[in-house]
């Protein structure tokens, strides 16, 4: 029912854009589990979504992020990273933006 003081949540970015994380905090977003709602934030996100100008879009996303941080809509504490070593002899293996490894395409060069 949303009646709690703090919760831990996680999200893995599936595409490389700030809106991937910021959209989660828009009023009414189905993944807005904390029920954050702020008119200034929503307006900045709407502006970012409605412009084709890259600089204007970037400024609107920065504004939305500023509002989110000022209102403590979330407290980022961690970012997932993967680290690995791979021999130059191994080819064809790739890692998707979703975090999946595709070993089935791998080969070992002699």
Residue spans for each PLM region:
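Bilobed periplasmic-binding protein-like "clamshell/Venus-flytrap" ligand-binding domains
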Residues: 7-10, 52-88
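Short charge-dense sequence patches
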Residues: 9-19
């Amino acid at each position: 029912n949303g009646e709690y003081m703090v919760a831990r949540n996680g999200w893995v970015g599936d595409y490389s854009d700030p809106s991937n994380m910021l959209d989660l905090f828009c009023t009414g977003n189905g993944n807005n589990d904390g029920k954050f709602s702020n008119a200034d934030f929503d307006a900045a996100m709407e502006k970012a979504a409605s412009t084709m100008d890259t600089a204007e879009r970037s400024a609107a996303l920065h504004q939305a992020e500023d509002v989110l941080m000022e209102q403590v809509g979330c407290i980022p504490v961690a970012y997932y990273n993967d680290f690995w070593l791979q021999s130059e002899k191994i080819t064809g293996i790739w890692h998707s933006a979703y975090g999946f490894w595709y070993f089935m395409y791998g080969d070992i060069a002699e």
